[in-house]
Curated annotation (Swiss-Prot):
This is Adenylosuccinate synthetase. It catalyses: IMP + L-aspartate + GTP = N(6)-(1,2-dicarboxyethyl)-AMP + GDP + phosphate + 2 H(+). One of its GO terms (molecular function) is magnesium ion binding. Disulfide bonds: none annotated. The active site is at D13, H41. Binds 1 Mg(2+) ion per subunit. Its cofactor is Mg(2+). Plays an important role in the de novo pathway of purine nucleotide biosynthesis. Catalyzes the first committed step in the biosynthesis of AMP from IMP. It is found in: Cytoplasm. Belongs to the adenylosuccinate synthetase family.
């Protein structure tokens, strides 16, 4: 039995959805612990593409319980659209459960999110405009609406009316936007409540019952380490904690429950929105990575910025999360390159630096120090074992493992489930990896 956390080791979009989908086959329960519809993950099964935002990837396995935890923020309209999409694809949501204490995104959250981002001008942080930040802000301000309020609208209607009137003042006076009609909003959300009611539970208790029953539990992270509100590239971050520690808080369990942490990283680096990005490529190679890697956001459709693998932020993610092993994704995107660069350190104002600087202004001045490696110039998407990989690709993986001091357990070579090299099931198998801590193949 093992309880496993899957987190993003970069700026999100690392391929966590595919890795979680692979591991969900061996999991009894999959828990989404933070974030909202600002996150997006794509899973491809037998040529069919599933794009999910709030619902855990484990929903594609009919016997797997999927829990949306209390650390998330829920837009009921989008969630119901997602449920409807799954039903049209003949996927059951009978095993989907929603935390009664998760906070609810309201129409005014989306309006304020968009208006405040516009007001920032050239100081934009790259929000998705989905109302996530304002929802978390109300949670911290203790004026938020929770799912349990939504389920008890007859008794909590005064709370809804007060919140809408309060936000109307902000919409009108600060952003010059028309006010919302409280009764219209309440009736809209009453319909959402009726549709979601069968799924609402005490999520912390449900997870705890799974732990006591010795079930395999998979905690699915959203976004990535460098987007963490406390440990990321602030202020260009999300409003929650996508790191491994955040899984405990968002799921309502203690840290001793967690057995291992898997970090997911692309074989290169991407970032969406604003903020410093030392290895960003504005040339034809950056364009190639974006084109071959189909680097467009699942949630926003925005083009992702692309660059070389950054081992400095990789080491930082390993430290912050206590990574046990890595899943490296999209190795196949590098197949056509003559040479591949890896950022091994930074230069800041003429001084070498091997550690991630928390100061955003300092980080913006970082110049990458690269190690150049030969490319392999042959396709890898059909490889199913380490022995089938070109020696240059294996050397590249070995180098990444050495730089991060974390073994590589999974190598993904495409979007499909079958396009994966894996030796041991990270949930049921022993704590070993495809590459050991010295980067040597296990065989």
């Amino acid at each position: 039995m093992a309880n496993v956390v899957v987190i993003g080791a970069q700026w999100g979009d690392e391929g966590k959805g595919k890795i979680t989908d692979l591991l969900s086959k061996s999991a009894d329960v999959v828990v989404r612990s933070q974030g909202g519809v600002n996150a997006g993950h794509t899973v491809v099964v037998q040529g069919q593409t599933f794009k999910l935002h709030l619902i855990p990837s484990g929903i594609l396995y009919p016997d797997t319980e999927c829990i949306i935890g209390s650390g998330t923020v829920i837009d009921p309209k989008v969630l119901l659209e997602e449920i409807d999409q799954l039903h049209r694809l003949n996927v059951s949501t009978e095993n989907l459960f929603i935390s009664q204490t998760a906070h609810v995104t309201m129409p005014y959250h989306r309006l304020i999110d968009g208006a405040s981002e516009e007001m920032r001008g050239d100081r934009k942080i790259g929000t998705t405009g989905r109302g996530i930040g304002p929802t978390y802000a109300d949670k911290s301000e203790r004026t938020g609406v929770r799912v349990l309020d939504l389920m008890d609208l007859d008794n909590s209607q005064d709370k809804f009316v007060w919140a809408i009137k309060y936000k109307n003042v902000i919409l009108e006076k600060l952003y010059d936007l028309p006010p919302l009609d409280p009764q219209e909003v309440i009736e809209e959300y009453r319909a959402y409540a009726d549709a979601l009611r069968p799924h609402v539970v005490d999520s912390s208790l449900k997870v705890f019952e799974g732990v006591n029953a010795k079930k395999n539990i998979l905690f699915e992270g959203a976004q990535g380490t460098l987007l963490d509100i406390d440990h990321g590239t602030y202020p260009y971050v999300t409003s929650s904690n996508p790191i491994a520690g955040g899984a405990c808080v968002g799921a309502g369990i203690g840290p001793t429950i967690i057995d291992r942490v898997i970090g997911v990283a692309k074989a290169y680096t991407t970032r969406v929105g604003e903020g410093p990005f030392p290895t960003e490529l504005d040339d034809e190679i950056g364009e190639l990575l974006g084109h071959v890697g189909a680097e467009f956001g699942t949630t926003t459709g925005r083009r992702r910025r692309c660059g070389w693998f950054d081992a400095v932020i990789g080491r930082y993610a390993a430290r912050i999360n206590g990574l046990d092993c890595l899943a490296i994704t999209k190795l196949d995107v590098l197949d056509s390159l003559d040479e591949i660069k890896v950022c091994v350190a930074y230069e800041i104002d003429g001084e070498a630096c091997e550690h991630f600087p928390s100061n955003a202004n300092l980080f913006a001045r970082c110049q990458p120090i690269y190690k150049t490696m030969p490319g392999w110039k042959q396709p890898t998407s059909d490889c199913r074992s380490l022995d089938e990989l070109p020696k240059e690709a294996l050397a590249y993986l070995k180098f990444l493992a050495e730089l991060m001091d974390v073994p590589i357990a999974i190598v993904s070579l495409g979007a499909g489930r079958e396009q994966t090299i894996i030796v041991e099931d990270p949930i049921h198998g022993p704590k070993r990896a495809l590459l050991d801590r010295n980067g040597e193949p296990i065989g």
